[in-house]
């Protein structure tokens, strides 16, 4: 059986990347929350 996680850099950044997060208001809220929490990495 094939594993479910087949990593792809392009797809990951397209779906969970910084620019995708910035493009929506809820995405910006996520970034804000992660900044407040003090996350080292904001996005994938």
From Swiss-Prot:
Compositional bias ranges of the Basic residues kind: 1-22, 31-44
Gene3D superfamilies (UniProt xref): 1.10.287.3980
Record has Ribonucleoprotein as a keyword: yes
Keywords: Ribonucleoprotein, Ribosomal protein
PROSITE patterns per record: RIBOSOMAL_L34
Region listing for Disordered, in residue ranges: 1-44
One GO process term, biological-process aspect: translation
Family: Belongs to the bacterial ribosomal protein bL34 family.
Protein name: Large ribosomal subunit protein bL34
Organism: Alkaliphilus oremlandii (strain OhILAs) (Clostridium oremlandii (strain OhILAs))
